[in-house]
Amino acid sequence: MAGLWKTFVLVVALAVVSCEALRQLRYEEIVDRAIEAYNQGRQGRPLFRLLSATPPSSQNPATNIPLQFRIKETECTSTQERQPKDCDFLEDGEERNCTGKFFRRRQSTSLTLTCDRDCSREDTQETSFNDKQDVSEKEKFEDVPPHIRNIYEDAKYDIIGNILKNF
């Protein structure tokens, strides 16, 4: 009878473990894993935290799950033993738009993630090229010794000649 109980407990334990392994992750959990993986590569630099996420319209566990979310720098650095969720955002912290795919099949998972800077937030500085003086080719090389000038000119014409040979 004791052997039957041990077998029963073993079967129940295996069933629980297999159910947990096959449990479908929620989108929020996948995004948390993606941010955790992104922050692991930032030794000594500020950690990023979730700002907003856009879940996919449908989630099929047999296919790639598209990821789309925004993250922002926090006050915590990766050397500290703190979770980014416990950290405040930096006031002028960098924001990034992240896209990727999460794929899970049986026991293997795959995550592809790209986080690009949010250029729409950055202030653009317009520079006028009219303010700069137009410097001629000869004026650029007035202070350069003649031997160096000749080497430069020869290299310039060799490069142009090689480019034109390809056409």
From Swiss-Prot:
Acts as an inhibitor of cathepsin B (CTSB) activity. Plays a role as a negative regulator of tumor vascular development, cell invasion and metastasis. GO terms for cellular component: cytoplasmic vesicle; extracellular space. PANTHER family: CATHELICIDIN, NEUTROPHILIC GRANULE PROTEIN. GO terms for biological process: defense response; negative regulation of angiogenesis; negative regulation of lymphangiogenesis. This is Neutrophilic granule protein. It is found in: Secreted; Cytoplasmic granule. GO terms for molecular function: cysteine-type endopeptidase inhibitor activity. The gene is Ngp.
